[in-house]
A protein has these predicted regions:
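N-terminal low-complexity, intrinsically disordered "leader/linker" segments enriched in small/polar
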Residues: 1-20
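Polar, low-complexity loop segments and adjacent catalytic/binding residues used for recognizing
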Residues: 19-218
Length: 218
């Protein structure tokens, strides 16, 4: 630790205070699943987490093993691949914040979503190809005409002060300059929640592959 020789060095007098970003977790791949709870997933294959494979009528979920507070600004990034299966493929995946981490969400077009989630996003691939934001099981935003049936990189930047979430999507690991979805009025209370993903197939199928994820409090 560097020696601090003045009150300015100790307390930061005379200079602006900055918030240090803190990485809560980082999975560049899933060679290790320590800190995760898997519920009926297809397991890890070649260091990638298959939430489902192309089995019909399947549903899987994965959660962090520890519930924490999200009433602070953060950036969550993940790489998710939907591939293989039938034509048309189905059904997609969800990202959600839940009070529990030991159950599967709904199958088919519910894509593993838990109705108890305080915040959730679904990314559907079957026919409707839509993005939907749910808050306490009530639809807030629905955007059709999307294409999540590919290997995509995602960033979700949450500003707690302005109650705004901006979601960016790209086919490369370079974050776009502009957000694909800007969600206003999105906020977290002081409760502790598990962040997690769900995915499901129905009569039509696809692989739902979580390739990486990282959470940084900003």
């Amino acid at each position: 630790m560097p020696f601090l020789s003045s009150l300015e060095g100790v307390f930061g007098y005379g200079r602006p205070q900055t918030q240090t970003a803190v990485v809560e977790f980082n999975y560049p791949n899933f060679s290790s699943t320590a800190g995760l709870v898997e519920v009926s997933t297809a397991g890890v294959i070649s260091n990638l987490l298959y939430i489902t494979d192309t089995t019909g009528g399947d549903v899987g979920n994965v959660y962090r093993s520890t519930a924490i507070q999200y009433n602070r600004s953060f950036s969550f990034e993940w790489n998710f691949e939907c591939s293989g299966g039938t034509s048309p493929p189905a059904d997609g995946f969800c990202l959600q914040w839940t009070p529990t981490n030991n159950t599967n969400g709904g199958g088919g077009g519910s894509v593993g979503y838990l109705t108890t989630a305080v915040q959730a996003f679904t990314f559907l691939t079957y026919i409707n190809n839509s993005f939907t934001w749910y808050k306490n099981n009530v639809i807030q935003t629905n955007v059709t005409g999307q294409n999540f049936y590919q290997n995509l990189f995602y960033w979700a930047d949450y500003n707690h002060t302005t109650s705004t979430m901006r979601i960016y999507v790209s086919t490369t690991n370079t974050k776009p300059a502009s957000a694909n979805f800007t969600l206003t009025g999105l906020s977290f209370d002081s409760g502790n929640y598990y962040i997690g993903f769900g995915a499901a197939t129905g009569g039509s199928t696809e692989n739902h592959i979580l390739r990486s994820m990282k959470l940084t409090f900003t």
